[in-house]
Amino acid sequence: EYTLGGETVLYRHEKTYVNKTRYAVSLCSCMDDATIDAKIAAIPAVDYERIGERMHLEMIYVNYGAEAGADKYLELVKKAVATGKTLVLGCDDVEVAKAALEIAKAGKPILNGANASNYEAMNALAKEADVVLGVSGANLDEIYDTVAALEKAGNKNLIIDATGASLKETYANAVQIRRAALKDQDRTFGYPTIVNTSKLAVKDKYMQEALVSLFTMKYGSIVVVDELGYAEALPLFGPRQN
């Protein structure tokens, strides 16, 4: 398990960031088996020590591609569980999410699937499995209202997916969420955040690398990327540690 969020400053030089950003590699059931297997096989390659601290990939984001069907997604979840990494289950289909949690719940995954239309059912699943629930929405107002509704239902074990339709929107989301929590003391936005760079720069690994660096500073608790080999890890893990 990893501790996320808990930050008290907007800028690192004001004090420090207390809980470092965690990186996740994205897998999707929409991928072919060869691609999935190759990406999973590459995960252990990044594992080294820097200044007495282990540097390795901590998480896997397991995305549900509805067009591939539930069965393939559940098989992918099984493969991801076998890696021993912490999982983020990116699935907003309640029935598929329920089945995925049955497979993965022992490892305490994050269920990133709540939105304005399904949050009640997703909340029930997350509370039953005792896992963190991820909240997304069409815009910040919708996310805010959904988080408030979940809090009213008694769930504060949440994480906010700040990923928007564009880089500009995502950056604004991340900054506004942090500022609302710290400057305005609005605890409805006082949760860790997920930023998915694989959605912001589709199949552009160089842009994704730049965006991972950006959202390490601005204010991703979990940042998702398509791949994180040794060459990509070196320029990210050093600044994150510093």
Regions found by a protein language model. Name each.
Residues 117-242:
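Catalytic alpha/beta core domains of metabolic enzymes, predominantly
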Residues 2-145:
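Active-site beta->alpha loop and helix N-cap motifs at the rims of alpha/beta catalytic domains
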